[in-house]
Amino acid sequence: MLCIQSTKTLTLNPLDPVERDFLSIYSIMYDGLMSINDDYLPETDLAEDYSVSPNGKTWTFKLKKDLKFSDGTDLKASDVVATANYILNKAKNNSGYYLNLKYFVSSISAEGDYTVVVKAERAYYGLLYAMTFPILPAHALEMNNPPGTGAYVCEAFHPGVALRLAPNPYWEQGVPQVTRIHVNIKPTAADVLSAYEYSGTDAIFTRSIASAQYKGGASSLALDYRTNQLECLLMNHSAFPLNLKSVREAIRCIVDVDKIARSYYNGMVERTDTPFISGTWMYDDSLSNYFRTDPVRAMSILEADGWLDVDEDGVLERLNDKGEYVELKMNLFVYEEPDDNVRLETANYIRDTLGAYGFKVTVQTMKFTDVQQALSVGNFHLCLASYAMDVCPDAGFLLMSSNTGNYCRYRSTEMTDLCKELRKQMTQPDYQRVLFQIQRQFAEDCPFICFFYRSGTVLTRRMYTTVRDVRESELLKGIDTFRTN
């Protein structure tokens, strides 16, 4: 018996999920052409193999034969094409969970029943990550609870109350090891935790900071999982004094991100110093000296750039172009999530810590929509915010000059060129090489500060998986093949 949080999911549609917990439900009901393994590398799933043309812009995927959807109909290339085109058509209006597919695929077609041909926007290794979207039958794209090829089917769903999963009678691997999954649905994170503590629930998914108290309990196992939510301290390069690299570097040296993770997030994070996932093939761990907490170095950097406490009021000043002293002052915008006030606590810590070293920081709590507006027009100094990172390891949208997520107004010809170069790579080693160059440029330029990826916890009374890399969208991965001794 599983318990999840949900208030918005009224129908089951894997192409348009509206709540994160349902992604894990869908992950054991539906499959993509490709999947991502424990090393965060793409591998074939419904596809048996694939090939790419010499110019890198035509990809050919061969489907496994004799696969069926849960309604007994055969999986054909036409189903893959119909699913992709459904996503691409919605993406024309910037809608749909998988809308980023439009940046990878220019067209898709079927050659016979078992061959899918994808014309790519560019020669780019990242396309393989984009081909992980769930495949549905062509006739069921807008159906509630459509057939899939995964290990389970939903045999009953009562929105806001419960759903029940049973084995897919046509699953290619036979009968899954766990043959019944009952899912209770609760409206709040607190209700989910209560269900685990008092109602005999076997497992829950939670991102609540309060769940840390259950870790290490004699009757519970805790599986930490990584979300795609990258928490950052954004710094506006178009606003004084953050247009000065010295000030940005000093902030990076003073703010103790490890303390934030430990004291305010209860360790429910996966630390990273760059926009990429640490501990994986994509992460350059040789850059740690750039990100070391060192207030002494911070003060040295500021002093070398002319910042002094001239009037001894505890706030640093510097001469501007007019020969006038200006203070080292800035605002810090923050918005809160409904379930906790951890960001506000973090903002207050940053204010107090920077204040001890001559910064004058004013924290302003705002509505999410107001922060969005401030970021879009550049009316801020500092902002605690998060990015929902795509499944493809490519941070160009927030690093390239004038790109959509570059709220910091960071301008670097070198970085933009590197991001463009990344999108020309066709092999994993070459892709990794350019990713490392991007991270070194990020470390040198200090455009903003990456804190960590938020994490959550699966609390369970019984182990059900051997997966090493537990990700938020696939929290039930492995339950279909797990064997108990």
Give the residues covered by each predicted segment.
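Gly/Pro-rich hinge or "lid" segments in bacterial periplasmic/extracellular proteins
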Residues: 37, 123-180, 185-191, 295-300
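Surface-exposed binding/hinge segments that line
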Residues: 51, 96-140, 156-158
